[in-house]
Amino acid sequence: MPRVKNAVVARKRHKKVLKLAKGYWGAKSKLYRVANQQVMRSLLYAYRDRRAKKRDFRRLWITRINAAARLNGMSYNRFIEGLRRAGVEINRKVLAELAVKDQAAFGQLVQVAKAQLESK
């Protein structure tokens, strides 16, 4: 059986990993074994944080909506419940955007929610 050399494949793999590790500090960007460990860890962090980002943004939106709703004399959960009963289907991302950039429109939504809660 002929001998199989691995040099070309190994060099390609090493170059790929070291390219991904570019910008890392010290040996993590120079030595293949250390760089490979760091790249694998970095990919795990990226995977985890892509999921965490969704939770973090939802938390931020809720905080902004709550702050704006309280400025209009209403708590977050009462506001959301009032909108739900009124049949207003605006997601939290858009509500947070309105709360920050268009307080007048947000105030009108608060009035709609208040009216719906009082009419039950």
UniProtKB/Swiss-Prot annotation:
Pfam families on file: Ribosomal_L20
Keyword Aminoacyl-tRNA synthetase (UniProt): no
Record carries keyword rRNA processing: no
Role, per record: Binds directly to 23S ribosomal RNA and is necessary for the in vitro assembly process of the 50S ribosomal subunit. It is not involved in the protein synthesizing functions of that subunit.
Transmembrane segments: none
Cysteine-cysteine disulfides: none
Annotated GO CC locations: ribonucleoprotein complex; ribosome
Protein name: Large ribosomal subunit protein bL20
One GO MF term attached to the UniProt entry: structural constituent of ribosome
Assigned keywords, A-Z: Ribonucleoprotein, Ribosomal protein, RNA-binding, rRNA-binding
GO biological process: ribosomal large subunit assembly; translation
Family the entry assigns: Belongs to the bacterial ribosomal protein bL20 family.
Superkingdom of source: Bacteria
